[in-house]
Amino acid sequence: FYIGGMGAKSTNFHKELFIRMGYEEEANKIQDLFMEGKRDEAARVLPDQLADDMALIGPKDRIRERLQAWRESKVTTMLVATTDKQTLREISELF
């Protein structure tokens, strides 16, 4: 929704962010499909790599391996999305 439908077609912060991340072709296609009312088709354009670039996903060891790059980036806030207490404990150990 954010890439395709937030703001005006010519002014969309989220689309511009994904373009800066190297996903220009996909961002343009997503927005075009979204504007045509083809939301499901637009969602299928999202590459799996984009999710991996945007989030620390996977087992604890994989997150640990990738966390240093995030610490060295411009990221200032991280969100943990889980309701599982054990997962929260494990993630807190990484910090």
Task: Label every model-predicted segment.
Residues 52, 76-81:
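Hydrophobic faces of well-ordered beta-strands that scaffold small-molecule active sites
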Residues 69-76:
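A structural motif corresponding to the C-terminal end of an alpha-helix
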